[in-house]
Regions:
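Generic amphipathic alpha-helical segments used as scaffolds and interaction surfaces in large
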Residues: 60, 64, 124-127, 151, ...
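Short, motif-level signal for alpha-helix interfacial/capping segments enriched in acidic residues
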Residues: 9, 108-115, 342-345, 373-381, ...
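Conserved ATP-dependent motor core of P-loop NTPases, especially the RecA-like helicase ATPase domain
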Residues: 16-26, 60, 77-283, 515, ...
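Conserved motor-region signature of P-loop NTPase helicases/translocases
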Residues: 1-71, 75, 83, 152-158, ...
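Conserved ATP-driven helicase/translocase motor core recognized via long
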Residues: 2-3, 29, 55, 196-364, ...
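Active-site-adjacent bridging/hinge elements
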Residues: 38-41, 106-113, 137-142, 321-324, ...
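Core structural elements
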Residues: 125-138, 188-214, 343-350, 364-369, ...
Length: 658
């Protein structure tokens, strides 16, 4: 990392006294009170800068997070209003610190003025500028429609996948298919590679996710138009020689066995090589890749396999095989160069053509909002000043998931004067598939006016906090990337009920690492996951038994299943743990992406509703009673006689007398 890009030292943030100007980056590790501090910054900006609720821009990346921030900030304002009216902080450290600092004797704001500003903000809080990134961009563009160069009436779409694919199909038809018709070998290569309009669409989607990235085509040479003909000529020569000399080659190799390496060129391997060459020539494709087994009969492979002091078997075919391998590689490189040339042309023209089609059809996607605002800010410098006057201060939440385009927008509007606060934790970056880029976070930190960390973990116990500090600080490059560092945190002062486990035979410890039993064989990933799930379920079952006996508890309260969380890396692993827990008779709730309508509970509810809808249908009744909710076994269901069901002629609804 260059000296210019090296991040400055981070200071521990005291949110109630830090300067409210410039560009500030705050690294907020998990559990350190990120939202609490955002609320404090918001209140200080509102009071000390005399800003309205609609003037402080707060941006986060999901609608759920936006709603949470909205309610948390409103709640803080209401608490503060009550404290100013009554003179009582209610024991809340948030309010107490504000009364000591911003509203204290050393502060420049008297309580009466502060109360007016708080009440003004609460009255107008429905207009608070707390948005997702896309909602902010849309509002900004609506305030400057001519600069945005967007249609006044348009169809907002979540994405432009259908239009992208339409464009890709057109390019495939007009550019790729004519080239494939001219070069049959290229057509075969496209089929073998799985190329098609979908591949073009995927390339364009990646390009649109990072519109500021510079495309570099270094090392992409011009296609060698003679490569296919050279490969065909070499193939014909080799095939002809093989037809004439196969038996002689076989005999030669048998004779040469004593001088050949018996790991790579043992008799069975040479038999496979002979068969592979015969099959390859029978296929008749001059540019097809040589089978791996066939490569054992190239001169290069035979020289390598010859024992020290031995004489390498000699035959013209071995040299021709070497030449054919090189010719096939050259033909492959030519096809690849043709495809890359097409991709380069495609990515050069497609973004502009896609934008033109969208304008014609009055369609705008969410990603277009960002691109259009960025373009408008670059084209019209006055727009940045207009937006800065509209939003004199900004707080960006989850900044680690910001992509280069998003940061460029905020940087253009708010830097260098600010106040702009960028709050996030690079260790929790999860949206790389949406083009979020950790290097954006690191670059922003290098150029920030000030960098802070939140150093008090309010969520975990002191033992867990200490263990995490020792675990991650034992390696100065625990997160690999330069600049992605671990800052030690300390536990908060909140008193928690201690966890007591009187049934644990092992050494006490809040942070433990389990290892699967070792063995001589290879442990497959599938088997390792199954063993881990079983071990996890067994431990939970042990804790639940201890809870029933009063030995496993939180303070004086027996431990309950709801006190236990199992963290996994994938949804599939979560489903595995849930199934294994069920075999132990332990119920669990899985937080997954699947629709609630695809769950087992939904299927059972559907069966019950179907039985209610048709009370005379014995089959539906049996299906409903077989649900887990009723617990009837097969014997009980079979004993249900047709007479047990309601008569089929009963009306579905009984009229209510008027």
């Amino acid at each position: 990392m260059s000296a210019a890009a090296r991040p400055q030292a981070a200071l521990e943030l005291d949110v109630f006294v830090c300067p409210l100007d410039g560009v500030n980056q705050i690294e907020a590790s998990a559990g350190t009170g990120k939202t609490w501090n955002i609320c404090a910054l918001y209140v200080r900006l509102l009071l000390e800068k005399d800003l309205g609720a609609d003037q402080i821009l707060v941006v986060t990346f999901t609608k759920a997070a936006t709603a949470e921030l909205h309610e948390r900030i409103r709640g803080r304002l209401a608490q503060l209003a009550h404290a100013l009216d009554t003179g009582d902080d209610g024991g809340d450290p948030f309010v107490a610190r504000l009364l000591e600092t911003t509203l204290g004797e050393a502060g420049a704001l008297d309580p009466e003025t502060a109360a007016k500003r708080i009440r003004r903000a609460l009255r107008a809080f429905d207009q608070a500028a707390i948005h997702t990134i896309h909602a902010f961009c849309q509002r900004a563009l609506q305030e400057a429609p001519f600069a945005a160069a967007m249609p006044f009436a348009f169809d907002m779409q979540a994405d432009d996948a259908a239009l992208r694919f339409e464009l890709a199909a057109d390019f495939w038809r007009t550019r790729v298919e004519p080239m494939a018709a001219r070069w049959p070998g290229f057509a075969t290569w496209l089929v073998d590679s799985g190329a098609g309009p979908a591949a073009l669409d995927a390339q364009l989607a990646r390009r649109l996710k990072k519109p500021l990235a510079a495309l570099r085509w270094d090392g992409v040479g011009e296609p060698d138009e003679s490569a296919e003909a050279a490969a065909a000529a070499c193939f014909e020569e080799a095939a002809r020689m093989w037809a004439d000399e196969r038996d002689a080659i076989d005999a030669l190799l048998r004779t040469a066995q004593p001088v050949l390496n018996q790991r790579s060129h043992k008799p069975d391997a040479l038999v496979d090589a002979l068969g592979a060459w015969s099959a390859h020539f029978a296929q008749g494709d001059a540019t097809a890749a040589l089978p791996k087994a066939a490569l054992k009969l190239t001169r290069t492979a035979l020289v390598k396999a010859t024992k020290k002091g031995g004489a390498t078997p000699e035959h013209p075919f071995f040299d021709v095989a070497d030449a054919l391998e090189a010719a096939v590689a050259a033909a492959e490189a030519t096809q690849h160069a043709r495809w890359l040339a097409l991709i380069a042309d495609w990515l050069d023209m497609a973004p502009a053509e896609l934008a033109e089609r969208k304008r014609t059809r009055r369609v705008v996607s969410f990603d277009d909002l960002l691109a259009n605002l960025y373009r408008a800010l670059n084209t019209h410098p006055w727009l940045a000043e207009t937006l800065r006057e509209r939003y004199p201060a900004a707080l960006i939440d989850e900044f680690q998931d910001t992509d280069p385009l998003q940061f460029a927008i905020f940087d253009r509007i708010f830097a260098p004067r600010g106040p702009l606060f960028l709050v996030g934790d690079p260790k929790q970056a999860i949206y790389s598939f949406r083009a979020a880029d950790l290097h954006t976070y690191l670059a922003a930190r290098a150029s920030a006016s000030a960098c802070y960390t939140l150093a008090v973990n309010q969520r975990s116990t002191p033992a867990i906090v200490d263990a995490c500090n020792r675990f991650f600080m034992s390696n100065p490059r625990a997160f690999v990337l330069d600049g992605l560092d671990y800052y030690a945190v300390r536990a908060g002062t909140r008193v928690r009920a201690p966890f007591v486990d009187g049934t644990d035979p092992g050494p006490a410890g809040d942070f433990r690492i389990w290892t699967l039993p070792g063995g001589d064989g290879t442990l497959l990933k599938h088997d390792a996951q199954a063993q881990a799930a079983q071990a996890c379920a067994a431990e939970i079952a042990r804790l639940m038994r201890g809870a029933r006996e009063g030995d496993a508890r939180l303070g004086d309260t027996p431990l309950s299943p709801g006190d236990i969380a199992v963290l996994v890396q994938t949804h599939r692993q979560g489903s595995l743990v849930k199934r294994v827990l069920a075999t132990w008779g332990i119920g669990s709730v899985e937080l997954a992406q699947a629709s609630v309508f695809s769950t087992g509970d939904a299927e059972q509810l559907e069966r019950v509703l179907a039985a209610i809808d048709a009370p005379g249908d014995l089959r539906r009744l049996r299906a409903a009673l077989a649900a887990d909710w009723f617990g009837l076994d097969a014997g009980a269901l079979s004993r249900l006689a047709p007479g047990d069901a309601a008569p089929s002629h009963h009306p579905r609804h009984t009229p209510h007398p008027l």
